[in-house]
Amino acid sequence: MAGPSGAAPKKQASLLGFFTPKTVNGLKRPTSSRPGTSEEDEERTADSSPSSRDNVRKRPLEQDPDAGNTRRPRASKRAKNVVIDDEDDEHDNDDDDDDFKLDAEAEADPEPVVAADDTAGVSQSSSISASRAGRYIYDESQPKGQAKTDENGDALDAATLRKKRELHDKFVKKLGHPDAMSRWGNAGRGEQETGAQEEEEDGDAAEEEPPPPPKGKKKGAKSGKLTPMELQFLEIKRKHMDTVLIVEVGYKFRFFGEDARIAGKELSIVCIPGKFRYDEHPSEAHLDRFASASIPVHRLPVHAKRLVAAGHKVGVVRQIETAALKKAGDNRNAPFVRKLCEVYTKGTYIDEMGEMDAQTGASGAHSGGYLLCLTETAAKGSGTDEKVDVGLVAVQPATGDIIYDSFEDGFMRSEIETRLLHISPCELLIVGQLSKATEKLVKHLSGSASNVFGDRTRVERVAKGKTTPAEASSHVTKFYAGKLKGSTQDDRAAALLDKVLNLPEPVTLCLSAMITHLTEFGLEHIFDLTKYFQSFSTRSHMCINGTTLESLEVYRNSTDHTEKGSLLWALDKTRTRFGQRMLRKWLGRPLLDKERLDDRVAAVEELFENRNGPQVEKLQKLLSSIKTDLERSLIRIFYGRCTRPELLAVLQTLQRIAVEYIVVKEPSQTGFKSNLVSEALASLPRIREIVVSYLNRINPDAARKNDKYEFFRDESDDTGDDGEDEITTQKMSIAAVEQELDAHRSDAAATLGRKKAVDYVTVAGIEYLIEVPNTEIRKVPASWAKISGTKKLSRFHTPEVVRLIAERDQHKEALAAACDAAFKAMLASIADQYQPLRDAVSSLATLDCLLSFAQVAALPGYSKPIILPDSHPPTIAVAGGRHPIAEHTLPSGYIPFSTTLSSPAPLAHLVTGPNMGGKSSFVRALALLVLLAQVGSFVPADSLRLTLSDAIYTRMGASDNLFAGESTFMVEVGETAAILRTATPRSLVLLDELGRGTSTHDGAAIAHAVLDHVVRNTRCLTLFITHYQSLARVAEGLGTGLVRNVHMRFTSSRDDNDDGDKDQDDDVGENITFLYEVADGVAHRSYGLNVARLARIPRKILEVAARKSRKMEEDVRTRRLRSATKLLEAVCRGDGSDDQLEHLLSSIEQL
């Protein structure tokens, strides 16, 4: 602008003065002010946008022959271009051809000079950019002595001048070098091709875009404020602080804060640093956003499983509104509505095909999949941490099994340990406070990553109020009363409620807590299945305690706690997952009912004898063809979490099973003699009508592709379903909209002046685009919205197309909701038929286990056990018995043994022998043969005759119990005391080296007393291993034939010295050969030095040990000889009593 009259004109240095003159197309651009160019023109040049200036600098220089080397024509053109830009801003629909035409007119008329009056519009158009850059301008051209003024003419003080100088210095530093403006204008956007040469070559004029506006501060960025989405997340997170939240954000799922750190560690994904806390802690005040991590949408199931398997509680927050419905709603400017839709933990994750079992099984760690609720109260009249009353409820959501129990436990907490080891929970829910002893037990069993459950167990706690028993009973009653309102079977419903209300108080307390807990996960409906409530303590099954499970290696070996090398591993020949689970239950619960056991053994025998027959082969082929875990899939249908492909697979598999035996109407028509097999096969065809009725409504091709829109068959006979009617309605609405879109093609063609209807195209997922060549762009109405384009054509949506697409999208969203609702209704309908379908699957599992036992029976050396009647005295008679696990793992096979235990004699075997001679293996093999016989399997023996044992108790191994602060000897006597309290005359007891944890005299005395008690008082069948020679001799006096001394046979030989003489100085050179055979008599030595030599103890140490051992033996023999001499003298004098005479005879035998 011109300065005031009478004053020197205000002059601003051009930015071009900062740049080095550059040669463009062979001509050097002048750096001084151009002749004939006004000051306003120079100011405009300085204040114009970077992109415009860059375009001017890069435009080719064309020399005008009339104007010489002057630049007036270019100045005129630049002025005119600025005006054209203003016009373009006012008319957004001007196309590239119009811009090119205006540029061409400017080139054809270069003469007019821009006068002062003509620059008014130019100055006005550049006022915005001038005001934006004005605060960076520092004018050094002000005359001395004249006060410097601002834009309004007011004088500036020193502070303002200093500030303007600093801003000027920053401006020069940032932009005062060649190509600075060019780089600034093109940053982040890529270089814009706006040169005149490219315009002429392409034939199209590129639109000149204004420079991108400076990016303002985002919400939640450096201002420290959270974005609306982050506030939304924080609101949900504060209600679920114990949950790792996975939030749906667009096409990804994201983690925020501490959840992102956890996800980065567990999932091995990148965690972008930021705030980890959710409480605005001062230590994170310098951070402006949450830490975050993200995963693709399609990987959600995989990563969710990994987090759950790692022991985390995982929640999925989903967007519960779609873009189409949001656009049509009132909250279009608000963030998507998000809600916590799913919550998972180890015990409540219902995976599709048992993937979590596959993950844990691969590492050898396998839990039972149970969620176990535990509570306890102090028993009346007992001290702190002594006896407690315990209640538990265990639920296996993947199969629908429910176990409950209420019992009293002692200070050793052996009963709780037994149930925990049997159930193997993957998650514990503890109600109230536990006693110190129970707390330590739970911590020990669940705390480590390689615990006896197989993997780390998640523990959650629930507070217990003062009036909890009454509240729990009321809560359970209301829960089941609500279920009974809609029930049509009154008798069944009444029986259901009566069964639940008669549960013990501790069990009711746990049941109430479990209902509340599972409601969060949407799994509370599992308690509707009261048919599958089972009491842990029942007289129809043998109770195997936790110590016995570990000692006999029933479920996993004792070395690395994997399944390989266990009894389950040796017997598992099942073909289905649900069959394998039933086999596991059978091994942990041997039968006590002789009639049921005889039926099972007879079924195994028939399948074994006809193993090559067509009927057995047909059954084997059917089971081998089942690839779906039907038990898990049925419970997922019951919960309403089954997918469409999975539902189709389940129904088709059940149909194939039912059709296979469609001709069977009665058990007698199966062709098998066994009642167990016949009844199981006869139950399979009964589900055919149920399955077929649902398959007739399903389109199999769409179900396999998980196509919700075509899942239901259009020609289905069932047309009364409201959900399917709604699907039809929405499909018709969509078809009507698409028909209108097709008819609109003619209207669009008429608008463009075409006779033929236009064709729609789809580009980058955008449908119903109308393509118009840029040469016909003038025919396009202003109301048409340009979506995209190329150099030769543009693509538009007409207002009618936009309206119809929005209407169609709304119908599509409604159709998707109708399809989901109809599918959920179908799942609910199938859930009403859960029990007959589950019974059919149970029959298949039974057949699978029986076939597995038949396959085991076909192994060499297996025979059918003979079960003696209950009236027969307790007896176990084995001929040629072998260890069922060791013979699979030992390359040289297992040496058979033969023995007999019976009442009245011999009730017990006192087993002696050298270390590593096979004593423990012998007693374990005998116990495993009994267990196998009572689960209905053939046994690895020439023959086995036995009565049913009500329990198997073991006290084996030597280890301390640090978690309970118990020494090795304390563990020994504690377990022994539990056996003495609970053993009955029909129990089998195994005691291995009792008393080794203390001194020789005390240990021998305790072992003697315990052996005397189990033989004289309890009178149970017992195998007693010992190294005490005195105990072997004393056992002979316990009664005529009550205790039989047996030992493990071996041979010994000595090595020659270097001189060729026998080594007489020590026992180091003595070689022991183990024969692993059971023989009568006592082994007088344990040959511990031989084991030490095998363990490679240094020879010098062995030589010293041998001398000490020989000296101690001589001292003991000397003392015994002196004692016997005194007794003999007393007897000779006639002073001795009958007891002394008996003692003398015993001493002589010991010598």
UniProtKB/Swiss-Prot annotation:
Keyword DNA-binding among record annotations: yes
Lineage, highest ranks first: Eukaryota, Fungi, Dikarya, Ascomycota, Pezizomycotina
Organism this protein belongs to: Pyricularia oryzae (strain 70-15 / ATCC MYA-4617 / FGSC 8958) (Rice blast fungus)
GO molecular function, one term: ATP-dependent DNA damage sensor activity
Subunit relationships: Heterodimer consisting of MSH2-MSH3 (MutS beta). Forms a ternary complex with MutL alpha (MLH1-PMS1).
Localization per Swiss-Prot or TrEMBL: Nucleus
Binding site for ATP: 913-920
Chief place where the protein resides: nucleus
Protein name: DNA mismatch repair protein MSH3
Coiled-coil ranges (or none): none
